[in-house]
């Protein structure tokens, strides 16, 4: 990490359909090889499926899914006197959001539905209802932090 300058945060333009900055970040994470139009069609297609299946506002389902997947606490390795401890630390807001987005997309990609649109919509609906692989990942992270609570005094 550079000691001189911290990188400037880039301004992210809200998506054209819903006007949401977090949704743009999500689309950018879905995107492969700079193909943003493909990523947009995947996300908007998944939102159309959510709207028809759940009869709910897809943005609200998306936000609920992100909230249910975002971890509050995680473990970080800390070396103390030759031993490495897994120290539980709180997760800052930006990292919470980034992890939630990353885990949702990984979980969607590992599903067995036919298209990415179907996989993403199914994972978002599951996450909004506190089910699915992404929510399990968050619970595993919390369980790991709880198991290592004894080392919380090593926080930095």
UniProtKB/Swiss-Prot annotation:
GO terms for cellular component: small ribosomal subunit. Pfam families: Ribosomal_S7 (PF00177). InterPro entries: Ribosomal_uS7, Ribosomal_uS7_bac/org-type, Ribosomal_uS7_CS, Ribosomal_uS7_dom, Ribosomal_uS7_dom_sf. GO terms for biological process: translation. It comes from Methylobacterium sp. (strain 4-46). One of its GO terms (molecular function) is structural constituent of ribosome. Belongs to the universal ribosomal protein uS7 family. PROSITE patterns: RIBOSOMAL_S7. Keywords: Ribonucleoprotein, Ribosomal protein, RNA-binding, rRNA-binding, tRNA-binding. This is Small ribosomal subunit protein uS7. HAMAP family: Ribosomal_uS7_B. One of the primary rRNA binding proteins, it binds directly to 16S rRNA where it nucleates assembly of the head domain of the 30S subunit. Is located at the subunit interface close to the decoding center, probably blocks exit of the E-site tRNA. Part of the 30S ribosomal subunit. Contacts proteins S9 and S11. SUPFAM superfamilies: Ribosomal protein S7. PANTHER family: RIBOSOMAL PROTEIN S7.
């Amino acid at each position: 990490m550079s000691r001189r300058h911290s990188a400037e945060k880039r301004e992210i333009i809200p998506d054209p359909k819903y006007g949401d900055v977090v949704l743009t970040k999500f689309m950018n994470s879905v995107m492969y090889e700079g193909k943003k139009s493909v990523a947009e069609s995947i996300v908007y297609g998944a939102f159309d499926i959510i709207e028809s299946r759940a009869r709910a506002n897809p943005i609200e389902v998306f936000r609920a899914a992100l909230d249910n997947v975002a971890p509050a606490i995680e473990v970080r390795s800390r070396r103390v006197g030759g031993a490495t401890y897994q120290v539980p630390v709180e997760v800052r807001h930006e990292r919470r959001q980034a992890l939630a987005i990353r885990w949702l997309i990984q979980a969607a990609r590992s599903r067995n539905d036919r298209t990415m649109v179907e996989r993403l919509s199914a994972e978002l609906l599951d996450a909004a209802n506190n089910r699915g692989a992404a929510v399990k990942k968050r619970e595993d992270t919390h369980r790991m932090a709880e198991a290592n609570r004894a080392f919380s005094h090593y926080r930095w």
